[in-house]
Curated annotation (Swiss-Prot):
Residue span(s) of domain Ras-GEF: 246-494
Top-level lineage group: Eukaryota
Keyword tRNA processing listed: no
Gene Ontology CC annotations of this record: plasma membrane
Record's keyword annotation contains Phosphoprotein: no
Tissue: Detected in oocytes, and in embryos at 4 to 120 hours post-fertilization (hpf). Detected along marginal blastomeres at early epiboly stage and throughout the margin at the onset of gastrulation. At 60% epiboly, strongest expression is found in the dorsal shield region and is restricted to the epiblast. Detected in the anterior border of the presomitic mesoderm at the end of epiboly. Detected in adaxial cells, in the somites and in the nervous system during somitogenesis.
Keywords, in A-Z order: Guanine-nucleotide releasing factor
Domain N-terminal Ras-GEF positions: 76-206
One Pfam family cited in the UniProt record for this chain: RasGEF
GO biological process: Ras protein signal transduction
Protein name, entry field: Ras-GEF domain-containing family member 1B-A
Function comment: Guanine nucleotide exchange factor (GEF) for Ras family proteins (in vitro).
UniProt lineage: Eukaryota, Metazoa, Chordata, Craniata, Vertebrata
GO molecular-function terms, A-Z: guanyl-nucleotide exchange factor activity
Length: 514
């Protein structure tokens, strides 16, 4: 994971001919000066238990109006700013008179894994539920149990629906079964609710396992392009234009892949990708025994694959005219991705076209009409912290909010930049304050960013699937970086001594030629 993050955060989207994506040095420090304003869209839990009836919900007027502590929690302007870990855990647990705000539930379940394992949190929650509400007492007031049981079930339902991957841990499932058994005993209504929640969770985990198996199968079937070339004559090699010559159709199929892979990324993966040892924890790293961010990593690897596929398709053709045609085709595909709101595929295509083996093909580029490509590069220009892209992303997000069709709902962010933003938020602000309190102000902002992603990933792709095109995009052999350079030199010869030396070296090592 450390190597993965180093590679991801250390790369740069350069001028033509330089190496990948963006420099982290240009990233400004991310503070929390604007948190209160930004959090207006995130309703928060009232700072003390609020009485509500079965249908009336919260009394929204019962807020503290000044800075003060409340049972280990610190508020400012009605916003929860910090608190001890134990107080925050208690704040998560419903009582007869109180149910935590959904925003607080999501934020705490997301961020708590920086301090303790999810199974440890579940154990504490179960203990508080049983102990505080006397669920273990056979003489417990049944009316009281009937009041608290729906709220505990609702909390567990929100946990299993939003963070289902936590329950791949057998310890989580054990605690869940023990608590739900106490709640459902003797009440047929609660027993059905527990059964429905459990079945939904199992379906999600089964689907995840099937997705991971399919992904592993796809990855194992991918071979190096150069190896294929050695065994098959180039004349019978398939290329992208023989599979699909319509830019709009290809952009739609790319969007299918993007949305499918986005949908399997759990919100917790953004936190677990950067998790470090809590200074107040004497135990080992919380996630040393977890698959921390495998779906997130797989999605970043898809970006890299698409970039290399684009470069491979451009460098493959022998004829200059054909190479120019492929470049213009991908420019049109990139433009359609932009129109759809698929910024990740757009950036992957631009990255592939800016790789040195492609950008050095000057005779080929001379035959290309680059006006549309220049506009797309301008939209994704990394200067001013990707200002142009962020403006376009806000426009796509607004379009999604007011959408009249499923197509208008699509927002697929440039994913590596999203990860980078979250990384710098995490690195720029301490998890704990000097007094040992959890810095919850930081986690409101973290949750805000991840919540936006959660909205984007739930969109269903409205386009028809083309299995042949999808299969090609996912499994077509691609060149390695060295093979790309070799293909580039074979297409347009070396221009200086350094390139000549590299060409000879590559021919010797890759083709066993001198």
């Amino acid at each position: 994971m450390a190597k993965f993050l180093a590679e991801l955060l250390g790369c740069t989207l350069p001028e033509k001919g330089a190496s990948p994506m963006f420099e982290c040095r240009s990233q400004p420090h991310i503070g929390l000066r604007h948190v209160t304003k930004q959090r207006d869209k995130m309703p928060q839990t009232p700072p003390f238990p609020v009485m509500y009836g079965s249908t009336n919900g919260y009394n929204k007027n019962l807020y503290k109006a000044k800075e003060e502590d409340y049972e280990g929690l610190y508020y400012h302007d009605n916003n929860l700013i910090s608190g001890s870990l134990e107080a925050l855990i208690e704040h998560l647990v419903p009582t007869v008179a109180y149910y935590p705000d959904r925003t607080y539930i999501f934020t705490f379940l997301l961020s708590s894994r920086l301090f303790l394992h999810p199974y440890e949190l579940m154990s504490k929650v179960c203990h508080l539920c049983v102990d505080q509400q006397r669920l273990s007492d056979p003489q417990a007031d049944k009316a009281r149990v009937r009041k608290i049981a729906p709220k505990i079930l609702q909390l567990l339902t929100e946990w299993t629906e939003t963070f289902p991957y936590d329950f791949r841990d057998e310890r989580m499932m054990k605690s869940l079964k023990e608590l739900t058994h106490r709640l459902s005993t003797g009440e047929d209504l609660y027993r059905k609710a527990v059964q429905q929640m459990t079945q939904t969770l199992i379906r999600k985990l089964t689907t995840l396992s099937q997705y991971e198996e399919a992904l592993a199968k796809i990855n194992s079937s991918v071979t190096d392009r150069l190896t294929v070339l050695k065994t098959k004559p180039q004349s019978i090699q398939r290329d992208i234009l023989t599979i699909c010559n319509d830019p709009f159709t290809l952009a739609q199929q790319l969007t299918h892949i993007e949305l499918e892979r986005l949908s399997y990324i759990g919100p917790e993966e953004f936190v677990q990708a950067f998790v470090q040892k809590d200074p107040l924890d004497n135990d080992k790293n919380c996630f040393s025994d977890h698959k921390k961010a495998s779906n997130l990593e797989a999605y970043v690897e898809w970006f890299n694959r698409l970039s290399y596929l684009v470069a491979t398709e451009i460098c493959m053709p022998v004829k200059k005219k054909h190479r120019a045609r492929v470049i213009e085709f991908f420019i049109d595909v990139a433009r359609e991705c932009f129109n759809i709101g698929n910024f990740n595929s757009l950036m992957a295509i631009i990255t592939g076209m800016n790789m040195s083996p492609v950008s050095r093909l000057k005779k080929t580029w001379a035959k290309v009409k680059t006006a549309k490509f220049d506009i797309l590069e301008h939209q994704m220009d990394p200067s001013s912290n990707f200002y142009n892209y962020r403006t376009a992303l806000r426009g796509a997000t607004q379009r999604s909010i007011t959408a009249h069709s499923s197509r208008e709902k699509i927002v697929i962010p440039f994913f590596s930049l999203l990860i980078k933003d979250i990384y710098f938020l995490n690195e720029g602000c301490a998890n704990r304050l000097p007094n040992g309190h959890v810095n919850f102000e930081k986690f409101w902002e973290l949750a805000k960013q991840v919540t936006e992603f959660m909205t984007w990933k739930k969109v269903e792709c409205p386009f028809d699937r083309d299995r042949k095109i999808l299969q090609y995009l996912l499994t077509a052999p691609v060149f390695s970086e060295d093979a790309l350079y070799l293909a580039s030199y074979e297409s347009e010869g070396p221009e200086n001594n350094m390139e000549k030396d590299r060409w000879k070296s590559l021919r010797s090592s890759l083709l066993n030629r001198t």
